[in-house]
Design a protein with these regions (language model features):
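Active-site histidine-anchored catalytic micro-motif
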Residues: 4, 8-11, 15-16, 25, ...
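Conserved anion/nucleotide-ligand pocket segment
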Residues: 171, 175, 179-219
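Low-complexity, highly charged intrinsically disordered N-terminal segments
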Residues: 53-81, 85-92
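Extended hydrophobic packing segments that form well-structured cores
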Residues: 271, 388-497
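N-terminal amphipathic/basic leader segments beginning at the initiator methionine
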Residues: 1-58
Length: 497
């Protein structure tokens, strides 16, 4: 069997001012290789694609490489970049004439001129290969699934985990289901439903968070005869597009009405449990009062509003600014992306004093540029993994590294700040440990991303965690992200009905 394998993966925050260009993909994972050996070696132990390749190898299937492009979440993808990658995919498919196409897609990509990026990509491929060549794709748990995507894919499998530790497993299942279909000859039918909701990502953890009962219910349905797959999606709230929000896909070998009934049931479940996705946000003045009232404790202040894995620019200063203003000391900050300050630090060298404006340079949504006088305490240039979380569930996560570029640790009177040249996620690692810094010396940590992810990596000390009421394009209060112009209406909580 000849299998075309590729991917296009980006979670697009349409409220983020930073456009996603080709360099954004190359900084994460990008390959356009005709050579199978080069392609398979590139994805030898990566988070994505590896699951497809290993299972195809088990069946001795031939791999036909397609472009594979993965970028860290940010703003709109430049049209020329997407069109070039799509056209290259179509050229490769037309030339190689595969028996099946396997793709790793996010499901929440937005391109200039293409709101439904994955729908456009899948429909373009289906128009080329026809009904006789199936298209199987894996989607992120936070995909904004559209009817066009469902119509043009023969099978869509969503991740069942947050954090996303089952990517390889789901890719492998795609290949296994295809071979089962070849062997048994069953015909699959897929149904879809979408409730009128827009949910924040902050509490979508599948290990006790709001998505836990949905995944459990999906697994129960999958025990029924004829049910191939049930995928509930939390959706991504930072994309202003028509189908932003949660959805459900169900694929069966029985009547499609069976699949639709399952989708409708879980859709109603989303409506009934919608409030479980919204978390309490702690006002910063109360956080400061709490810290001052019990200074011997350790605190972690989570900034989800500037989450780099949700498209935030990661140069937000709002929380740090308020803590400094409130007289808080011994602060450790992970991270602020600022190329100017990084360059200044590297030119000055370790031990030097630098003065400048830190952060707040992407837009006016994440705080002001802070005037600083700081000592350059560390300069680092080395690869750092994306994940180091412990536990059996992370055993097959993959050795994915992120391009931090140059890293400078600068120290002011009140804070040590990790400043990066590139925007990077740190929620699944203890960045301080990788920089040979003992995070226990800080009274307060300021961390960007999901609190539940950080807890796994700062478990050596008991912290009091606060999810701060902050500002930014990932605000868990979805009514405060920005003006939604394209999403279907009415939708909760934007219309509060």
């Amino acid at each position: 069997m000849r299998a075309a394998v590729g991917g296009f993966f980006h979670e697009t925050n349409t409220f983020c001012a930073i456009r996603t260009d080709l360099d954004s993909f190359k900084a994460r994972d990008y390959i356009d290789a005709d050579d199978v050996k080069e392609f398979t070696e590139y994805f030898n132990d990566a988070r994505e694609i590896t699951g497809f390749l290993r299972t195809l190898a088990k069946y001795n299937d031939d791999v036909l490489p397609l472009p594979a492009a993965f970028a860290t979440p940010s703003g709109l993808i430049e049209k020329d970049v997407y069109v070039a990658i799509k056209e290259r995919m179509l050229e490769r498919i037309a030339f190689t004439k595969p028996d099946v196409v396997f793709l790793n897609l996010h499901g929440a990509a937005v391109v200039e001129g293409f709101d439904d990026c994955e729908g456009d990509l899948l429909s373009s491929i289906k128009a080329l290969v026809g009904e006789g060549t199936p298209i199987y794709a894996v989607l992120d748990l936070h995909a904004n699934v559209s009817p066009l995507m469902v119509k043009n894919a023969d099978l869509l499998l969503g991740y069942n985990t947050e954090p996303h530790v089952d990517i390889r497993k789901r890719e492998s299942e795609c290949v296994e289901i295809y071979h089962r279909q070849l062997e048994k000859g069953f015909v699959m039918k897929t149904a879809y439903a979408q409730p009128p909701l827009l949910l924040p990502a902050i509490n979508t953890d599948t290990n006790g968070g709001a998505m836990t009962p949905f995944i459990a219910q999906a697994f129960e349905y999958e025990k029924q005869a004829g049910v191939i797959n049930v995928s509930p999606f939390a959706g991504f709230y930072g994309s202003d597009k028509y189908n932003a929000g949660p959805s459900i896909i169900c694929t069966v070998t029985t009547d499609v009405s069976d699949a639709q009934a399952i989708c409708n049931d879980i859709s109603n479940m989303f409506i009934d449990r919608k409030d479980s996705f919204f978390v309490h946000l702690d006002p910063l003045d109360k956080i400061i009062c709490t810290i001052k009232s019990a200074p011997s404790k350790k605190y972690a202040v989570i900034d989800e509003c500037d989450d780099p894995l949700g498209g935030g620019p990661a140069d937000g200063t709002y929380i740090l600014d308020k803590l400094i203003e409130g007289g808080i000391n011994k602060i450790g900050v992970s991270t602020i992306c600022d190329r100017e300050i990084t360059e200044m630090a590297f030119v000055a060298g370790e031990g030097a004093v630098i003065k400048g404006l830190l952060g707040g340079k992407t837009d006016n949504k994440h705080g002001r540029s802070l005037p600083i006088t700081a000592v350059v305490t560390k300069l680092i240039c080395k690869p750092i993994p994306m994940c180091e979380a412990n536990g059996e569930e992370f055993a097959d996560y993959g050795e994915t590294y992120t391009d931090y570029g140059r890293i400078a640790v600068i120290s002011t009177e009140q804070a040590d700040i990790v400043v990066t040249e590139n925007k990077v996620p740190t929620e699944m690692i203890n960045i301080f440990r990788h920089l040979d810094i003992d995070s226990n010396k800080y009274s307060v940590l300021v961390l960007k991303g999901f609190g539940h992810s950080y807890k796994a990596n700062f478990s050596d000390k008991e912290y009091v965690y606060f999810t701060a009421e902050s500002i930014g394009v990932n605000n868990p209060d979805v009514t405060k992200i920005g003006e939604f112009k394209k999403i279907r209406r009415p939708v909760y909580p934007l219309d509060m009905k």
